[in-house]
Regions:
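An aromatic/glycine/proline-enriched structural segment found at the starts
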Residues: 5, 48-52, 87-152, 309-340
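Conserved, carboxylate-rich catalytic/transport cores that coordinate ions
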Residues: 77
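Peptidyl-prolyl cis-trans isomerase
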Residues: 7-10, 14-16, 68-70
Length: 340
């Protein structure tokens, strides 16, 4: 491990191979309605210059992949891999007394060096009133995305919002799934997410639906967003059910080394207190209906929603325009406007 960290080689043939693989992955993502939506969405929310503007899939763009050289990788490693900017996380049957001598032997010669400071940047609130369309001729489904920029991580309401998300779009019996899948049979499954980050996070709903229910499903998604944000807060038996679901799973949450490792990574990367997960179960059990309602109001803002629909536009565009949700912009698969 130390040799890889301290003396990376980046063989030219393997760099070329990985670039080909990454380009192939990008092509596959663009061919799939759901993943092409997740590629485009960040630029619609953050613009093109923000640190979070890159595709949510993590694969980048063809032009940037093509431009990367072996020298770029070596330069990046020299710049960012520093001991005083690193954290080593070890999980297993080992003590610090056993671990420290081995670490000193392996990494003791790694000279301290300051890495540049990263600037995440700010971003304006989503203005809403925009509907973006991407054509996928003959697609049997439309992928509907409703999204906006929300608050940064590390707020007091984070834990309550985690619980809201589970009941809104994080389970097979969540509100979105009960509506679009179980009740109406328009979708195989929906998702609501708010990925963790240090800067302003995206909140988004992804709802693949049968194409002939695109317009109607957008109406239902908008209704559910208004509901959870205040018109119909989580309460009563619905609240009790989600709390039972969340608390019954707590004892086994950290049964594996992988789970412990992920928790430690969260603490380091997101700036959580060291005792965040030690107090996690207690804090979850202390949540009440008001805490969930307050969190939903902080993080979910229906008036700021930006819409993105990927589907067969010759079949669905007219119905979408009838909703009068705002300016309609057609995009290509790279997220650039094709409006004349």
């Amino acid at each position: 491990m130390a040799d890889v960290v301290l003396n990376p080689v980046y063989p030219a043939d393997l760099v070329a191979l990985e670039k080909r693989r990454q380009r192939s992955q990008i092509g596959q993502e663009k061919a799939d309605p759901r993943t092409v939506a997740l590629r485009i969405l960040p630029r619609l929310l953050y613009g093109t210059t923000h640190a979070y503007a890159n595709p949510f899939t993590g694969s980048g763009d063809e032009s940037t992949v093509d431009a990367i050289t072996r020298d770029d990788l070596l330069r990046w490693h020299r710049t960012w891999f520093t001991p005083n900017g690193s954290t080593l996380i070890v999980t297993g049957d080992v003590t610090m007394a056993q671990l420290e001598p081995a670490l000193n032997a392996a990494f003791g010669g790694w000279a301290r060096k300051d890495a540049p400071k990263k600037s995440i940047g700010t971003v304006a609130k989503s203005a809403g009133g925009k509907v973006y369309l991407l054509d996928k001729p003959d697609a049997p489904q439309s992928v509907i995305v409703a999204a906006h920029v929300t608050e940064r991580g590390g707020l007091p309401q984070d834990l309550a919002m985690e619980t809201v998300l589970r009941n809104f779009g994080g389970m097979s019996t969540s509100r979105l799934n009960r509506n679009l899948r179980l009740d109406k049979h328009w979708s195989y499954g929906t998702q609501a997410a708010m990925p963790a980050s240090r800067g302003p996070r995206p909140f988004y709903v992804v709802a693949p639906v049968q194409w002939d229910k695109t317009k109607e499903a957008m109406v239902e998604v908008a209704k559910e967003l208004r509901g959870v944000a205040g018109e119909r807060p989580l309460a009563g038996e619905e609240f009790q059910s989600i709390m039972r679901n969340q608390t019954l799973g707590l004892p086994g949450r950290f049964d594996t080394l992988d789970a412990l490792e992920r928790a430690a990574i969260d603490i380091v990367s997101l700036g959580y207190p060291d005792d965040y997960y030690a107090n996690y179960a207690k804090n979850v059990r202390a949540l009440d209906e008001k805490a969930l309602a307050d969190a939903a109001k902080v993080f979910i803002r229906p008036d700021e929603i930006v819409w993105l629909v990927v589907g067969d536009l010759k079949k669905v565009e007219a119905g979408i325009r009838e909703l009068k949700l705002g300016e309609v912009v057609r995009l290509d698969e790279s997220g650039k406007s094709t409006n004349e």
